[in-house]
């Protein structure tokens, strides 16, 4: 992607987890991201069928996958699984994948939902999609930082 197309690109972002995958949608032009949906991570077939449906509906130009790390930046158990998920997305759907350090995305997502008074089951249901939104917003913020230097 280059020029105007890169600036107006649509992105889907994923917060990969063993039980659930949070998904967010965003646009590079507006630099805004919103929580979209949570996919139950039941098995590979279900996971990629659900992702395929989202890709058909939203037609993103690129994908962003959160890469879980320990606070000191070292990989942990989920790092390799998230990396594999991103590689599979790229292989199956032919879209470019960018990884974003998601060290504090869940903490930030939880705080954001609390600020908006989202409670109980609704908060639990939305948390992974909100974490994906945080990941995508972080990606857009990093793009902005690079453009201003």
Swiss-Prot record:
It is found in: Cytoplasm. Could be a nuclease involved in processing of the 5'-end of pre-16S rRNA. Its main location: cytoplasm. Belongs to the YqgF nuclease family. One of its GO terms (molecular function) is nuclease activity. It is an enzyme of class 3 (hydrolase). SMART domains: YqgFc. Keywords: Cytoplasm, Hydrolase, Nuclease, Ribosome biogenesis. Its EC number is 3.1.-.-. GO terms for biological process: rRNA 5'-end processing. GO terms for cellular component: cytosol. The keyword Cytoplasm applies. InterPro entries: RNaseH-like_sf, YqgF, YqgF/RNaseH-like_dom, YqgF/RNaseH-like_dom_sf. PANTHER family: POLYNUCLEOTIDYL TRANSFERASE, RIBONUCLEASE H-LIKE SUPERFAMILY PROTEIN. This is Putative pre-16S rRNA nuclease. The lineage of its organism: Bacteria, Pseudomonadati, Pseudomonadota, Betaproteobacteria, Burkholderiales. CDD domains: YqgF. It comes from the Bacteria. The keyword Cell wall biogenesis/degradation does not apply. NCBIfam families: RNAse_H_YqgF (TIGR00250).
């Amino acid at each position: 992607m280059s020029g105007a197309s890169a600036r107006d690109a649509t992105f889907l972002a994923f917060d990969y987890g063993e039980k659930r995958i949070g998904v967010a949608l965003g646009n590079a032009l507006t630099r805004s991201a919103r929580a979209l949906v949570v996919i139950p991570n039941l098995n590979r077939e279900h996971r990629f069928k659900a992702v395929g449906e989202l890709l058909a509906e939203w037609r993103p130009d690129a994908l962003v996958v959160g890469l879980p790390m320990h606070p000191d930046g070292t990989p942990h158990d989920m790092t390799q699984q998230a990396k594999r998920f991103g590689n599979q997305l790229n292989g199956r759907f032919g879209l470019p994948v960018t990884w974003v350090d998601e060290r504090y995305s869940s903490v930030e997502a939880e705080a954001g939902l609390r600020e908006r008074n989202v409670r109980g089951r609704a908060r639990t249901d939305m948390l992974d999609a909100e974490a994906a939104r945080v990941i995508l917003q972080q990606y857009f913020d990093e793009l902005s930082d690079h453009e201003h230097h």
